[in-house]
Amino acid sequence: MVREKVKVSTRTLQWKCVESRRDSKRLYYGRFILSPLMKGQADTIGIAMRRALLGEIEGTCITRAKSENIPHDYSNIVGIQESVHEILMNLNEIVLRSNLYGTRNALICVQGPGYITARDIILPPSVEIIDNTQHIATLTEPIDLCIELKIERNRGYSLKMSNNFEDRSYPIDAVFMPVQNANHSIHSYGNGNEKQEILFLEIWTNGSLTPKEALHEASRNLINLFIPFLHVEEETFYLENNQHQVTLPFFPFHNRLVNLRKKTKELAFQYIFIDQLELPPRIYNCLKKSNIHTLLDLLNNSQEDLIKIEHFHVEDVKKILDILEKK
């Protein structure tokens, strides 16, 4: 069998932000380039990045509203200019930023007459509003309006499925997509077989994160998808005629985890709680959510186990190890 040689660029790949602007509180734009790439690589990366940007990044939305004033979602309330449906649509458009996990409660409690805007939402500490001026409703008479809200962090979108409003609670269509649009284009340069490519990537976000933050998060998510292919402890790849065997490496931090287990007795581990480790809040919340409460629980998990935890990244393992090795 004849195999063609595959040319690989010896130049270091570099990325750069060539344009960044804020068109409004709820519209950010960024343009990035990555080069030099071999022919075909730019399209491969561009397609994967666009899908990750639009589908893999989490966002925070209001997903449910509840009020004793609301009989049903297409009704009108005396003293309020907007219909209930319009109020729910306005709540749907509120842009939020958070690092929360699970569901949180928020509240609107206003006395009319006056305008209700996003500024009037009483939020939990982990959530912030991007644009306080977003309109919710107009109270035309001196009435009290209280609306309980549910806030969630997720990815993709969630369409309301239930029409059962017996508890006066109304689901809201949620679009958990901070990236509003993403495009890629390719510029080729060079002659003949020496042609190389530059990838141009354009990103528009809703202001809950910048295009640069979106690019970093999408990249991390793609890396996490491919990491399982790098972790094969016992398996080997057999090449043609079984002449050579190549064993795939452990996860990069595997040996550090093993050494930590050897250094300290398990008896001590079970009395050290992760609360004492001064971990970053996001990492701490991920571990607690996975029923990891002590150092023994933590070290009984391999790196492969840890990165399977929702919202957990490879660099989080390094951060944990750095903290543990200083203790």
Swiss-Prot record:
One Gene Ontology CC term in the entry: chloroplast
Gene3D superfamilies linked: 5' to 3' exonuclease, C-terminal subdomain, DNA-directed RNA polymerase, insert domain, RNA polymerase, RBP11-like subunit
EC number: 2.7.7.6
Domain of life: Eukaryota
Entry function: DNA-dependent RNA polymerase catalyzes the transcription of DNA into RNA using the four ribonucleoside triphosphates as substrates.
Keyword tags: Chloroplast, DNA-directed RNA polymerase, Nucleotidyltransferase, Plastid, Transcription, Transferase
GO aspect biological process, one term: DNA-templated transcription
SMART domains: RPOLD (SM00662)
Keyword Glycosyltransferase: no
SS bond partners: none
Organism of provenance: Capsella bursa-pastoris
Location of the region described as Alpha C-terminal domain (alpha-CTD) in the Swiss-Prot/TrEMBL record: 264-327
Subcellular location: Plastid, Chloroplast
Record comment regarding domains: The N-terminal domain is essential for RNAP assembly and basal transcription, whereas the C-terminal domain is involved in interaction with transcriptional regulators and with upstream promoter elements.
Region feature (Alpha N-terminal domain (alpha-NTD)): 1-233
UniProt-recorded name of the protein: DNA-directed RNA polymerase subunit alpha
SUBUNIT field: In plastids the minimal PEP RNA polymerase catalytic core is composed of four subunits: alpha, beta, beta', and beta''. When a (nuclear-encoded) sigma factor is associated with the core the holoenzyme is formed, which can initiate transcription.
InterPro entries: DNA-dir_RNA_pol_insert (IPR011262), DNA-dir_RNA_pol_RpoA/D/Rpb3 (IPR011263), DNA-dir_RpoA (IPR011773), RBP11-like (IPR036603), RNAP_asu_C (IPR011260), RNApol_insert_sf (IPR036643)
Family statement: Belongs to the RNA polymerase alpha chain family.
Reactions this protein catalyses: RNA(n) + a ribonucleoside 5'-triphosphate = RNA(n+1) + diphosphate
One GO MF term attached to the UniProt entry: protein dimerization activity
